[in-house]
UniProtKB/Swiss-Prot annotation:
Function: Guanine nucleotide exchange factor (GEF) that regulates the assembly of the coat protein complex II/COPII in endoplasmic reticulum (ER) to Golgi vesicle-mediated transport. Selectively activates SAR1A and SAR1B by promoting the exchange of guanosine diphosphate (GDP) for guanosine triphosphate (GTP) in these small GTPases. Was first identified based on its probable role in the regulation of pituitary gene transcription. Binds to the prolactin gene (PRL) promoter and seems to activate transcription.
Organism of origin: Homo sapiens
Gene: PREB
Domain of life where this protein originates: Eukaryota
Cytoplasmic-facing ranges: 1-388
PANTHER family: PROLACTIN REGULATORY ELEMENT BINDING PROTEIN, PROLACTIN REGULATORY ELEMENT-BINDING PROTEIN
Primary location: endoplasmic reticulum
Disulfide bridge map: none
WD repeats: 4-50, 58-97, 127-183, 187-224, 230-287, 291-329, 334-385
Alphabetical UniProt keywords: Activator, DNA-binding, Endoplasmic reticulum, ER-Golgi transport, Membrane, Nitration, Nucleus, Protein transport, Repeat, Transcription, Transcription regulation, Transmembrane, Transmembrane helix, Transport, WD repeat
PROSITE patterns: WD_REPEATS_2, WD_REPEATS_REGION
Disordered as annotated region, ranges: 101-130
Name under which the protein is recorded: Guanine nucleotide-exchange factor SEC12
Length: 417
């Protein structure tokens, strides 16, 4: 796991904070911006077309959606609907991509210069309902409903996610409240205080249970607004000093080859920065009783974000120092690591989906992880397919070993057989 470089897939004209991949179209969606400050740095959501060209995965800018003075800090995807966390609000976007016959001129006076962003040329920003057409692919993005989701003195929505059937979305922010909203009307259906202080992350399970982690060092499991249990990762964890830890991220994941199986994965980081930083930890939990199954150290770099692959096979991690790693979910062993890939905090990571266009784009690799950071770059991390020995070859080797053993015994002891 030495030093290596990850290929740069795309560079945006603004800091990137959030990332999603649409499995049906293969669109990579990256969002961010410079915020409301008048620094000249724009805010937007970029839709990138992924293509496999000569065995290499590439990304080209297909559409740039202007978010005016609001930088998108977090994203969730449900079919053709995006939920974007922008300051204290959640903005729903709908995007539609389909093939067109022939190339048509771009509508709405677009100044887009083609699907690939040319060096030195700023991408055009698209207003509500704008369309872009390139090489037969049309993309239309429109703003839907928006609602304020956080009401603290310094309000900020920090996380958003959809439920399993995409009919509800949950938000959390700096005021410590979880709020659940209908999709797409954004009518509020539930509100409750989950943490004292900021909510760092939340995850909705297929059975409706909600897991929240906060800066108050707690991780809680909820059924609607009723507390089911609190997580205690140290019950099955390592023995260490009295250094306080807090939960940084949580994600549900499937159990490979077990359709009914469910796992919860959490990341624990030191609550305070120390001169000699203690390690961070990954924990796998039983998704039904929320007991810890396995805990492993994931290094001394503070983890900033977590993602789980679609099949639940792999975990992707980003750190505040810019490193990116891929772990296998079963044993929590590290399979891939790039130190300081970005050189600055990794703000989000996302796996290439394993359905839809995913297998076509993956090529001969086992999985692909995308990472974005404040350095405005989107990087690609590929895990080569692990070589395995065919069963027939193992059987042949066993038979050969038996024959050689018999011949050796026969030569050493002529009357043995």
């Amino acid at each position: 796991m030495g030093r290596r470089r990850a290929p740069e897939l795309y560079r945006a004209p603004f800091p990137l904070y959030a990332l999603q991949v649409d499995p049906s179209t293969g669109l990579l969606i990256a969002a961010g911006g410079g915020g409301a400050a008048k620094t000249g740095i724009k805010n937007g959501v970029h839709f990138l077309q992924l293509e496999l060209i000569n065995g290499r995965l590439s990304a080209s800018l297909l559409h740039s959606h202007d978010t005016e003075t609001r930088a998108t800090m977090n994203l969730a995807l449900a079919g053709d609907i995006l939920a974007a966390g922008q300051d204290a609000h959640c903005q729903l976007l709908r995007f539609q991509a389909h093939q067109q016959q022939g190339n048509k001129a771009e509508k709405a006076g677009s100044k887009e210069q083609g699907p690939r962003q040319r060096k030195g040329a700023a991408p055009a920003e698209k207003k509500c309902g704008a369309e872009t057409q390139h090489e037969g692919l049309e993309l239309r993005v429109e703003n839907l409903q928006a609602v304020q989701t956080d009401f603290s003195s310094d309000p900020l929505q920090k996380v958003v996610c959809f439920n399993h059937d995409n009919t509800l979305l949950a938000t959390g922010g700096t005021d410590g409240y979880v709020r659940v909203w209908k999709v797409p009307s954004l009518e509020k259906v539930l509100e409750f205080k989950a943490h004292e202080g900021e909510i760092e992350d939340l995850a909705l399970g297929p059975d409706g249970k909600l897991v929240t982690v906060g800066r108050d060092l707690k991780a809680s499991v909820w059924q609607k607004d009723q507390l089911v249990t609190q997580l205690h990762w140290q019950e099955n964890g390592p023995t260490f000093s009295s250094t306080p830890y807090r939960y940084q991220a949580c994600r549900f994941g499937q159990v490979p080859d077990q359709p009914a199986g469910l796992r919860l994965f959490t990341v624990q980081i030191p609550h305070k920065r120390l001169r000699q930083p203690p390690p961070c930890y990954l924990t796998a939990w039983d998704g039904s009783n929320f007991l810890p199954l396995r805990t492993k150290s994931c290094g001394h770099e503070v983890v900033s974000c977590l993602d789980v692959s679609e099949s639940g096979t792999f975990l992707g991690l980003g750190t505040v120092t810019g490193s990116v790693a891929i772990y296998i979910a079963f044993s929590l062993q590290c399979l891939y690591y790039v130190r300081e890939a970005h050189g600055i905090v990794v703000t989000d990571v996302a796996f290439l989906p394993e359905k839809g266009r995913g297998p076509e784009l993956l090529g001969s690799h086992e999985t692909a992880l995308f990472s974005v950071a404040v350095d405005s770059r989107c990087q690609l991390h590929l895990l080569p397919s692990r070589r395995s020995v065919p069963v027939w070859l193992l059987l042949l080797l066993c038979v050969g070993l038996i024959i050689v053993t018999i011949l050796l015994l026969q030569s050493a002891f002529p009357g043995f057989l």
